[in-house]
Amino acid sequence: MITLQNVVKEYTSRNNKVLAVDHVDLEIEQGEIFGVVGYSGAGKSTLIRMFNGLELPTEGSVEVDNLLISQIRGSKLRKARQQIGMIFQHFNLLWSRTVAENIAFPLEIAGVRGEKRRFRVNELIRLVGLEGKENAYPAELSGGQKQRVGIARALANNPKVLLCDEATSALDPQTTDEVLELLLDINKRLNLTIIVITHEMHVIRKICNRVAVMENGKVAELGDVLDVFRHPKEKVTQRFVRQVTDSDETEELIHLLLDNYAEGKIVKLLFMSENATQPVISQVAKENDVMLNVLHGNLTQTQNGAYGTLYVQVLGTEEAIEASLTQLRQLKVETEVLER
């Protein structure tokens, strides 16, 4: 669906050169929700603007739905952009137009007239849950409602791709989740390819199938969201994963557990996918004659599946404890004995 090959974007001023995107290769499949996460200045917004030709690469090629966006200009590019919707952090609505008129704007530009345009606008208002707000102006809407207008406007011409550039960064947590649920619903209903640019790992965890982590213009890490959360390889990825896993709190928790539970062994268990929801603990305890005391745990859901972390106190003989850990590993549960 979308292919980036050796894409470079360089900005040149009188005194220096800035390499915003540094030799990026990506393949994004039809119908997937693909996340790009990075801190400010990582190059992610520059990258997404090359998907619809708002920025042109200095080197390399950008192909969307078998069309080389990086090589077309003028009317051909304008026509191609009708198939690539985009929503923004600050909504970019026309403040003198109502909700319905904002949604109708791209249809007007595309030459859609009369009853056909009105039907499409009403259809989109229902899709994004804005019934009753048709004649409201942007100043009368909440942040979440404004973004829903932005989403409806971006979908007006039935695009195949939706670009989301920090689309939830200006929203509160509850509204963020509501907008993300809407994007998930639209993705499933329309089989729409969605590219999400964000600096919030919660957004990636909630809706994305795969993620690229960017740093200094490069893709530092790429993979399924579940794999990246479970085994982040690069330091920048580990920092992002800590946004969701609260590792500083975990470090404090480990010291607390080791200080307060002196008997037996304290073990960290990592469950994946189907094992995250199965009664593995009770099975292992029963079959190996050990006591497993659950001290702390959490379960994290992603679009690829769930993974869970448990901290347990294992009580029994040395042989029984070792046998229980061996069985857990055989059941594809990762184990880590915490050292005192």
Swiss-Prot record:
<comment type="similarity">
    <text>Belongs to the ABC transporter superfamily. Methionine importer (TC 3.A.1.24) family.</text>
</comment>
<comment type="function">
    <text>Part of the ABC transporter complex MetNIQ involved in methionine import. Responsible for energy coupling to the transport system.</text>
</comment>
<feature type="binding site">
    <location>
        <begin position="38"/>
        <end position="45"/>
    </location>
    <ligand>
        <name>ATP</name>
    </ligand>
</feature>
<dbReference type="InterPro" id="IPR018449">
    <property type="entry name" value="NIL_domain"/>
</dbReference>
<comment type="subunit">
    <text>The complex is composed of two ATP-binding proteins (MetN), two transmembrane proteins (MetI) and a solute-binding protein (MetQ).</text>
</comment>
<protein>
    <recommendedName>
        <fullName>Methionine import ATP-binding protein MetN 2</fullName>
        <ecNumber>7.4.2.11</ecNumber>
    </recommendedName>
</protein>
<keyword id="KW-0547">Nucleotide-binding</keyword>
<keyword id="KW-1003">Cell membrane</keyword>
<keyword id="KW-0067">ATP-binding</keyword>
<dbReference type="InterPro" id="IPR050086">
    <property type="entry name" value="MetN_ABC_transporter-like"/>
</dbReference>
<feature type="domain" description="ABC transporter">
    <location>
        <begin position="2"/>
        <end position="241"/>
    </location>
</feature>
<dbReference type="InterPro" id="IPR045865">
    <property type="entry name" value="ACT-like_dom_sf"/>
</dbReference>
<dbReference type="InterPro" id="IPR017871">
    <property type="entry name" value="ABC_transporter-like_CS"/>
</dbReference>
<keyword id="KW-0029">Amino-acid transport</keyword>
<keyword id="KW-0472">Membrane</keyword>
<dbReference type="GO" id="GO:0016887">
    <property type="term" value="F:ATP hydrolysis activity"/>
</dbReference>
<dbReference type="InterPro" id="IPR041701">
    <property type="entry name" value="MetN_ABC"/>
</dbReference>
<keyword id="KW-0813">Transport</keyword>
<dbReference type="Pfam" id="PF00005">
    <property type="entry name" value="ABC_tran"/>
</dbReference>
<dbReference type="Pfam" id="PF09383">
    <property type="entry name" value="NIL"/>
</dbReference>
<dbReference type="InterPro" id="IPR003439">
    <property type="entry name" value="ABC_transporter-like_ATP-bd"/>
</dbReference>
<keyword id="KW-1278">Translocase</keyword>
<dbReference type="GO" id="GO:0005886">
    <property type="term" value="C:plasma membrane"/>
</dbReference>
<dbReference type="GO" id="GO:0005524">
    <property type="term" value="F:ATP binding"/>
</dbReference>
<dbReference type="GO" id="GO:0033232">
    <property type="term" value="F:ABC-type D-methionine transporter activity"/>
</dbReference>
<dbReference type="InterPro" id="IPR027417">
    <property type="entry name" value="P-loop_NTPase"/>
</dbReference>
<dbReference type="InterPro" id="IPR003593">
    <property type="entry name" value="AAA+_ATPase"/>
</dbReference>
